[in-house]
């Protein structure tokens, strides 16, 4: 197995330019493909997940061109009518491609087979499929019911229909439905139960609006796209830096003295994970923000405070808090993280196992993790990453106290291929 050994380094400082947001990149690419007109999307993330979306769009007949030596893509939209009506799409483990494309293909009509790697076939999609069937889509499971792979067939979608979706598994299901509603000639989605990860739904709605469609809403319980809604190109649009990726560097500043500044995202970000900075501040870190940057440094006391925090609003960035808890002065509890269990791996179980290797006392439940740090971290732990990019990036922070080995470090290619180079650039 390939591994990366990180030597201990107690002090980190510097500036990191963030790559584009994965969540924004894949949403913008899909909306540009569905719109009328040509769209220039600037700053698209270069990573496995966006590659899967770009490849799928090309297979579906979308004309796109990348500007030389840049991450700008010119996309000629299809006005909601996919040029290719039959395709076999491999989407890896990219949930931000698989879920939205499932909805956009099911409501537009055609014959499609969607599949991915083994882990993608373990990630639930049944709630989204049922909601799409409620709008008249015809979808069958090609393997285990409730999970990919999927076969999509031409359906009988009735404009203005109403469907329901559960809100407690993944907000990506609702986001996928919202982006696809204009393809159905408008309609309504009602949310059953408490919606998790609300900031990601807000992000989706903001981007939909940038492409000329306004979705009416009743809080987070009911969303309606009016009949006749059509996506229109905004001309040019820019992808923010990835706020989830910012969390590792901001934590590095809080744990390693700092200051560490990230650029590409700031106080006006449309991403919910920007609130990770608030969580660090609650732990005592010094936080400062500008329009296009955030900076973190260690508390004046030199050590973070333990916290109890509801992480519903920052599910991805909350993983970074779990590792930061190793450096806090007591027991930290992170709650409302049930969605961790259906991500790239069961992140609650994986996090508990790997924190334990570093000497932490860890307690877990269905939707929480509680971490009590040891007096001294165990040096030389070999951290398994479970083919999960965020596990690899989170546990690099342990090297602020002890030497650590990261197994399968290349898994960061899913969202941030250059992560370890960027992390190394902060070593004083």
From Swiss-Prot:
Pathway: Metabolic intermediate biosynthesis; chorismate biosynthesis; chorismate from D-erythrose 4-phosphate and phosphoenolpyruvate: step 6/7. InterPro entries: Enolpyruvate_Tfrase_dom, Enolpyruvate_Tfrase_sf, EPSP_synthase, EPSP_synthase_CS, RNA3'P_cycl/enolpyr_Trfase_a/b. It catalyses: 3-phosphoshikimate + phosphoenolpyruvate = 5-O-(1-carboxyvinyl)-3-phosphoshikimate + phosphate. Phosphoenolpyruvate binds at residues 22, 95, 123, 172, 347, 390, 414. Gene3D superfamilies: Enolpyruvate transferase domain. The keyword Transcription regulation does not apply. 3-phosphoshikimate binds at residues 22-23, 27, 170-172, 197, 316, 343. GO terms for biological process: amino acid biosynthetic process; aromatic amino acid family biosynthetic process; chorismate biosynthetic process. GO terms for cellular component: cytoplasm. Its EC number is 2.5.1.19. It is found in: Cytoplasm. GO terms for molecular function: 3-phosphoshikimate 1-carboxyvinyltransferase activity. Belongs to the EPSP synthase family. Catalyzes the transfer of the enolpyruvyl moiety of phosphoenolpyruvate (PEP) to the 5-hydroxyl of shikimate-3-phosphate (S3P) to produce enolpyruvyl shikimate-3-phosphate and inorganic phosphate. Monomer. This is 3-phosphoshikimate 1-carboxyvinyltransferase. It comes from Laribacter hongkongensis (strain HLHK9).
């Amino acid at each position: 197995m390939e591994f990366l050994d990180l030597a201990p380094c107690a002090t980190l400082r510097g500036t990191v330019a963030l790559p584009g947001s994965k969540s924004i990149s894949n949403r913008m690419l899909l909306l540009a493909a569905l719109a009328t007109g040509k769209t220039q999307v600037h700053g698209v993330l270069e990573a496995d997940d966006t590659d899967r979306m770009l490849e799928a769009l090309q297979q579906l007949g979308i004309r796109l061109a990348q500007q030389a030596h840049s991450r700008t893509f010119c996309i000629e939209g299809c006005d909601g009518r996919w040029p290719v009506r039959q395709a076999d799409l491999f989407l890896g483990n990219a949930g931000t491609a698989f879920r939205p494309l499932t909805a956009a293909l099911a409501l537009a009509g055609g014959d499609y087979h969607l599949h991915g790697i083994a882990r993608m076939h373990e990630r639930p999609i049944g709630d989204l499929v049922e909601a799409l069937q409620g709008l008249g889509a015809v979808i069958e499971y090609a393997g285990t019911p409730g999970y990919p792979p999927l076969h999509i067939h031409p359906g009988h979608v009735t404009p203005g229909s109403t469907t329901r979706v559960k809100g407690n598994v993944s907000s990506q299901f609702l986001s996928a439905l919202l982006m696809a509603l204009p393809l159905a000639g408008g309609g309504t989605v009602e949310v059953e139960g408490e919606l998790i990860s609300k900031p990601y739904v807000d992000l989706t709605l903001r981007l939909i609006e940038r492409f000329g469609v306004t979705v009416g809403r009743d809080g987070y319980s009911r969303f309606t796209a009016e009949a006749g809604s059509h996506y229109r190109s905004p001309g040019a649009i820019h992808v923010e830096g990835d706020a989830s990726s910012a969390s590792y560097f901001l934590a590095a500043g809080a744990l390693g003295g700092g200051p560490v500044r990230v650029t590409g995202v700031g106080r006006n970000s449309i991403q919910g994970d920007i609130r990770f900075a608030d969580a660090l501040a609650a732990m005592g870190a010094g936080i400062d923000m500008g329009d296009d940057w955030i900076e973190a440094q260690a508390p004046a006391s030199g050590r973070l405070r333990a916290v109890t925090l509801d992480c519903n609003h920052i599910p991805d960035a909350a993983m970074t808090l779990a590792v930061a808890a190793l450096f806090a002065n007591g027991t930290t509890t992170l709650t409302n993280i049930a969605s961790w269990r259906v991500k790239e791996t069961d992140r609650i179980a994986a996090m508990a196992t790997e924190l334990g290797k570093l000497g932490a006392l860890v307690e877990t439940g269905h939707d929480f993790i509680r971490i009590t740090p040891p007096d001294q971290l165990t040096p030389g732990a070999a951290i398994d990453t479970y083919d999960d990019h965020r596990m690899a990036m989170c546990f690099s922070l342990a090297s602020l106290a002890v030497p650590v080995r990261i197994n399968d470090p290349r898994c960061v290619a899913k969202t941030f291929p250059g992560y370890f180079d960027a992390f190394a650039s902060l070593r004083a």
